[in-house]
């Protein structure tokens, strides 16, 4: 089948592999992106593929943490241009939307647009704001994390709202959680920077681990390693995969001698108790939204002829 320049571009962005290697892998995979990534990794050409992150839209991520640090809200509001995203009216709108979501019990954007705000339905409120600002604006998504019993939440915004994170921990005692509040903000900053795919090893689907074993075995076979040696090496490869892709296994950005789990454990112990991270949500502005092809795609097309 014909492989487009846009497909080659995306595969290059996700794997770091060369243009012709990407083209061949896509042809071998009949255009299936995930299969092409697997082919490149088995050949040892690609690193672990980045999540498809064709960031496109403008706007902002906003985070709100309740005064008692028991609930955190994260929301993405999109605009058509970055110019409007920097507009004070847009910023005020985002603040209002964020507060409204934090105080309501809505669970979906569809529900949100039917709720009352300032004596009108939210959908009508947004239409009026769009008319005032002069550009289409949409609440794309939102999430909340709330804790019951001994627990604490916090959040972090990176790059002026390009990335946002909320994270929660549970503790054996409330005073332990209170002592971890600031550390949890640092953990949220770590999540923004390191983008862990999973919370811990138990969160990784079994099929993902099996696929990593397959890829590791194919790489080692290519290097000429015998089967009995491959069998001994693979557990170490999987251990490294877990450490690099889970929040608790990653080295903490503010102290790379320790994992995030070690940092939390030690801080909780110093406060006279125990604690564990129970969940996190990370948003990156526009992730997953297709964007208009840039000139680079045309450049790739010219080189493929």
UniProtKB/Swiss-Prot annotation:
A Pfam family hit: EF_TS
Q: InterPro entries this protein is in?
A: EF-Ts_dimer_sf, Transl_elong_EFTs/EF1B, Transl_elong_EFTs/EF1B_dimer, Transl_elong_Ts_CS, UBA-like_sf
GO CC entries = cytoplasm
Q: Where is this region: Involved in Mg(2+) ion dislocation from EF-Tu?
A: 81-84
What GO molecular-function term can you cite, just one?
translation elongation factor activity
Where in the cell is the protein located? Cytoplasm
Which UniProt keywords are listed? Cytoplasm, Elongation factor, Protein biosynthesis
Job of this protein: Associates with the EF-Tu.GDP complex and induces the exchange of GDP to GTP. It remains bound to the aminoacyl-tRNA.EF-Tu.GTP complex up to the GTP hydrolysis stage on the ribosome.
**Per the similarity annotation, which family is this?**
Belongs to the EF-Ts family.
In Swiss-Prot or TrEMBL terms, this protein is called Elongation factor Ts
